[in-house]
Amino acid sequence: MELALATLGNQPLIAAVEVGKHLTWQLGPLSVHGQTMITTWVVMLLLIGLTFIGTRKLQRVPSGLQNFLEYAYDLLASIARNQIGEKQYRSWVPLIGTIFLFVLFANWLGQLPLRLFHIPEGELASPTNDINTTVALSLIALVSYIYAGLRKSGFGYFKHYFESPILAAVWVLEFFTRPLSLSIRLFGNILAEELVVAVLILLVPILVPVPLMILFLLTGAIQALVFSTLTASYVGEAVEDHDDHH
């Protein structure tokens, strides 16, 4: 789909927003979206760089980037503790934190003027603008909470789900709807935000889109918080019978 803004009559096209067009890379039998891979690498490099710089010279009294990283860790640890429980949360902080920070930076990256960088097909955008990215993140969440249940209870984790046909049906339904809702919620919100900003820039390129871009930075952070909190919540449910927190 292509949205375009042109002058009246036979004047040339002055701007366009492309949706659904992808730069395709062929990796053996697999076809991948090249622009998503590029922006995903950018996000990973940013996270690795910030972590390296922030922890290179640790101080007893933190300041600057170290202070920010410690605050972020405390926030993410509190999310994991509240959702998973005091006894189990520590081993899950790295996963919850990685998901939060990746989704946060991926969402924020989409608010930068990436369309200024031309590629042969499609355009650069947030990695979470691609349904493949959000599905992959959702599958990580799914595998994580199933692993958490198996680690605590073995195959007995599945036992109480099949005590009755109704519980079994509910569990099977949740098995599919949880990752589906996680992926579609994140993908839909980020795609809509970037489209709104892109169209406004086409229509009113000066000043007007700025407040919305600031708002979308906030909503991008909220989406990252929701995704990571729900992941922690699912893990907490998987271990709840073994934790006094529940």
Swiss-Prot record:
Entries under Pfam families matching the protein: ATP-synt_A (PF00119)
HAMAP family referenced in this protein's UniProt entry, alphabetically: ATP_synth_a_bact
Primary subcellular site in the record, as a coarse category: membrane
Organism: Gloeobacter violaceus (strain ATCC 29082 / PCC 7421)
Protein name: ATP synthase subunit a
Keyword Cell inner membrane appears in the UniProt entry: yes
The keyword Metal-binding is assigned to this record: no
Keywords assigned: ATP synthesis, Cell inner membrane, Cell membrane, CF(0), Hydrogen ion transport, Ion transport, Membrane, Transmembrane, Transmembrane helix, Transport
Top-level taxon of the source organism: Bacteria
Membrane topology: Multi-pass membrane protein
Gene3D superfamilies per the UniProt record, alphabetical: ATP synthase, F0 complex, subunit A
UniProt cross-references to CDD domains, sorted A to Z: ATP-synt_Fo_a_6
A single GO cellular-component term on record: plasma membrane
Description of how the protein assembles with itself and partners: F-type ATPases have 2 components, CF(1) - the catalytic core - and CF(0) - the membrane proton channel. CF(1) has five subunits: alpha(3), beta(3), gamma(1), delta(1), epsilon(1). CF(0) has four main subunits: a, b, b' and c.
InterPro entries: ATP_syn_F0_a_bact/chloroplast, ATP_synth_F0_asu, ATP_synth_F0_asu_AS, F0_ATP_A_sf
Lineage, opening ranks: Bacteria, Bacillati, Cyanobacteriota, Cyanophyceae, Gloeobacterales
Subcellular localization, as worded in the UniProt entry: Cell inner membrane
Ranges annotated as spanning the membrane: 34-54, 92-112, 130-150, 155-175, 196-216
